[in-house]
Amino acid sequence: MYNKLPISYSRKHTQFQSSIISEILVWIEGNLTNRLSLDDIAQHSGYTKWHLQRVFRKIVGMPLGEYIRRRRICEAAKELQTTNLQVIDIALKYQFDSQQSFAKRFKAYLGISPSLYRLSDTGYNDLLLLEPKVA
């Protein structure tokens, strides 16, 4: 009986966690082209890296690393269709180690290679599949 938290506390705590995660999402968006380590993100959030991962997954619905990879692929896909940058330059810009690792992830998410995606007219519609739903 005494170990249960009042519902109002639980709700406020969840709202607080959601606001922290929202701030982290904004920070990540501004840093997608930079190296992002779990330690850096945890330090920015004020959480330990283990707690951050647990809260992030609870609120966003996917692991932090997966979220970052998806966001990078989304932004890279937009650049493939809106710029003339070479695939390797886009891959490196979004912190992929090589064009091959970028192409492998890209194809895993969108079912098509970056080069073919650039030539296709599917555009941003496919990117909606990658957008996470924040709770």
Curated annotation (Swiss-Prot):
Alphabetical UniProt keywords: Activator, DNA-binding, Transcription, Transcription regulation
Domain HTH araC/xylS-type: 22-120
InterPro entries per UniProt: Homeodomain-like_sf (IPR009057), HTH_AraC (IPR018060), HTH_AraC-typ_CS (IPR018062), MarA-like (IPR050959), Tscrpt_reg_AraC-type_HTH (IPR020449)
Record carries keyword Transcription: yes
Pfam families in the cross-refs: HTH_18 (PF12833)
Gene3D superfamilies xrefs: Homeodomain-like (1.10.10.60)
GO molecular function, one term: sequence-specific DNA binding
DNA-binding region: 39-60, 87-110
Summary of the function given for this chain in its UniProt record: Transcriptional activator of 2'-N-acetyltransferase.
Protein's recorded name: HTH-type transcriptional activator AarP
Provenance organism: Providencia stuartii
Organismal lineage: Bacteria, Pseudomonadati, Pseudomonadota, Gammaproteobacteria, Enterobacterales
Name of the gene this protein is made from: aarP
